[in-house]
């Protein structure tokens, strides 16, 4: 990991700031979420939502999507140049749910994008506040990560569905900037690069001309982002090879897939942030909380605190379990889709189940679903402890990489060993160590073989009582090793259809 001096913290990325001290970061992150909260309150007024309707997570998501759509310049330009029948490129909207005569009814609203942009800027001191938009994108991405498995997308790019723990942020839009890049998993970056290389193989002009030069710059930038996520010299050296290739093709795809597999044990450094739905920030602002003055952090106690006293509702389908719906949203709020379930369970204070055992579908309701049978229920988003979010893959103190269970990318900086089935992973590495990356491949395989499942990661790091805001008394939990730790283990979650 590079020393902190050369890297902006991800709150700085998040707020587009230069190097700032801790208080300035807390203030600028506070300003960002405060702006989201003010915007949400204003939208509730525009839409004439009651208090309860404003606390409905489905309404929050619709409002968030409207503002993201209003600021999506590339798509707006495309829509204006390719008008489709029945769609006004200058308008945006979605389903808003209201309580009428003891039932929830769906109403489709439409607004001018210009009007939404005006309300957003007004809530953010007249600025575009791109950081706040990215924050909403990351919340949607975390929700997707907890809800869907990306098996199909993995198979399409020639990767193994068992690599799903590397897919954090796979549904983030391209325009999500540095903060978005920080939360993307190794598998997500590999997949983006493979798609790019495949286009280059199929389309002769992809790398040529003025456009091709821009494409090449984007390719090298993505390679550097991925390289920065790896924590061992051999993995980074292989990324240099991929980046410097004159004409990227199958050899590079092979190398990238090899690197993705290696990341199951030699894990990459991927940032985690607790991004909450807009209505949560709205509730806090409405109750008089001044985020900018108080300061806020996405990786400390603040989001836990906020969720302790926020009441958020969700629509529930007839055969869904409200407790399971709550777990899904809790995991999304803390970006914990790929965390070890033992750690999540300890922090939440209730058992966190694997995805396949949850009786719940996604949070959003499709337009053809019957509203007559919909109920609503309060989401239980509180926790027993809090823990610092990590941006490292959790390696031991020596630069020898520690082991990672297939399907874990730690979210919380909490001491644990990372059990994994080495045989399963190593089986994927038979043979192919020839070619220009042979020495690096051999070195990576050697490191993987030497990593022991019983190695402890995040030594001495623990969870904290919710009263311990300065994180002075770490409680180091002991875990029952017999429990399966991965969320998408042996799973049947729905696919995410992009």
Curated annotation (Swiss-Prot):
Keyword field: Capsid protein, Helical capsid protein, Host nucleus, Host-virus interaction, Ribonucleoprotein, RNA-binding, Viral nucleoprotein, Viral penetration into host nucleus, Virion, Virus entry into host cell
Post-translational modification note: Late in virus-infected cells, may be cleaved from a 56-kDa protein to a 53-kDa protein by a cellular caspase. This cleavage might be a marker for the onset of apoptosis in infected cells or have a specific function in virus host interaction.
Short sequence motif named Unconventional nuclear localization signal, residue ranges: 1-18
Highest taxon, organism lineage: Viruses
Recorded GO MF terms: RNA binding; structural molecule activity
GO biological process: symbiont entry into host cell; viral penetration into host nucleus
GO cellular component: helical viral capsid; host cell; host cell nucleus; ribonucleoprotein complex; viral nucleocapsid
Main localisation: virion
InterPro entries found in the cross-reference section: Flu_NP
Annotated stretches, region: Disordered: 1-22
Residue numbers covered by motif Bipartite nuclear localization signal: 198-216
Entry's localization field: Virion; Host nucleus
Function: Encapsidates the negative strand viral RNA, protecting it from nucleases. The encapsidated genomic RNA is termed the ribonucleoprotein (RNP) and serves as template for transcription and replication. The RNP needs to be localized in the host nucleus to start an infectious cycle, but is too large to diffuse through the nuclear pore complex. NP comprises at least 2 nuclear localization signals that are responsible for the active RNP import into the nucleus through cellular importin alpha/beta pathway.
Quaternary state and interactors: Homomultimerizes to form the nucleocapsid. May bind host exportin-1/XPO1. Binds to viral genomic RNA. Protein-RNA contacts are mediated by a combination of electrostatic interactions between positively charged residues and the phosphate backbone and planar interactions between aromatic side chains and bases.
Family per similarity comment: Belongs to the influenza viruses nucleoprotein family.
Protein name per UniProt: Nucleoprotein
Organism: Influenza A virus (strain A/Gull/Maryland/704/1977 H13N6)
């Amino acid at each position: 990991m590079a020393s902190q001096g050369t890297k902006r913290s991800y709150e700085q990325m998040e707020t587009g700031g230069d190097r700032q001290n801790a208080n300035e970061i807390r203030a600028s992150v506070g300003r960002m979420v405060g702006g989201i909260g003010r915007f949400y309150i204003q939208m509730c007024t525009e839409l004439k939502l009651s208090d309860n309707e404003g606390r409905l997570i489905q309404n929050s998501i619709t409002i968030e999507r409207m503002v993201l759509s209003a600021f999506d310049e590339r798509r707006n330009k495309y829509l204006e140049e390719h008008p489709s029948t029945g769609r006004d490129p200058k308008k945006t909207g979605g389903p808003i749910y209201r309580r009428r005569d003891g039932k929830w009814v769906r109403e489709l609203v439409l607004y001018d994008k210009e009007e939404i942009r005006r309300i957003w800027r007004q809530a953010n001191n007249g600025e575009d506040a791109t950081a706040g938009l990215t924050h909403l994108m990351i919340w949607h991405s975390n929700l997707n990560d907890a809800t869907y498995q990306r098996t199909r997308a993995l198979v399409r790019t020639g990767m193994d569905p068992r690599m799903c723990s590397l897919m954090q942020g796979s549904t983030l839009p391209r325009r999500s900037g540095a903060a978005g890049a920080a939360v993307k998993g190794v598998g997500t970056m590999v997949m983006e690069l493979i798609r790019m290389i495949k286009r280059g193989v199929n389309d002769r002009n992809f790398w040529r001309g003025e456009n091709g030069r821009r494409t090449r710059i984007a390719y090298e930038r993505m390679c550097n982002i991925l390289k920065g996520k790896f924590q061992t010299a051999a993995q980074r050296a292989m990324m240099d090879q991929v980046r410097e290739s004159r004409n990227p093709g199958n050899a590079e795809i092979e190398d990238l897939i090899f690197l993705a597999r290696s990341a199951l044990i030699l894990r990459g450094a991927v940032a985690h942030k607790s991004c909450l739905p807009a209505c949560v920030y709205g509730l806090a602002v409405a109750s008089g909380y001044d985020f900018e003055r108080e300061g806020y952090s996405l990786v400390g106690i603040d989001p836990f605190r906020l969720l302790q006293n926020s009441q958020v509702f969700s629509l529930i389908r007839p055969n869904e379990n409200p407790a399971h719906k709550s777990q899904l949203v809790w995991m999304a709020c803390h970006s914990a889709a790929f965390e070890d379930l033992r750690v999540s369970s300890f922090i939440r204070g209730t058992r966190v189940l694997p995805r396949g055992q949850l009786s719940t579908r996604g949070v959003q309701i499709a337009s053809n679903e019957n509203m007559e049978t919909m109920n609503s229920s309060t989401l239980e988003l509180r926790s027993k402890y809090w823990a610092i979010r990590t941006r490292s893959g959790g390696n031991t103190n020596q630069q020898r990489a520690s082991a990672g269970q297939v399907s874990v990318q730690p979210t919380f900086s909490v001491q644990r060993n990372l059990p994994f089935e080495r045989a399963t992973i190593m089986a994927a590495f038979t043979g192919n160590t020839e070619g220009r990356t042979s020495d690096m491949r051999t070195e990576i395989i050697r490191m993987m073989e030497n990593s022991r499942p019983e190695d402890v990661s995040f030594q001495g790091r623990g969870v904290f009582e919710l009263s311990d805001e300065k994180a002075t008394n770490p409680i180091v939990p002991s875990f029952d090793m017999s429990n399966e730790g991965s969320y998408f283990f042996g799973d049947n979650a729905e696919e995410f259809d992009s």
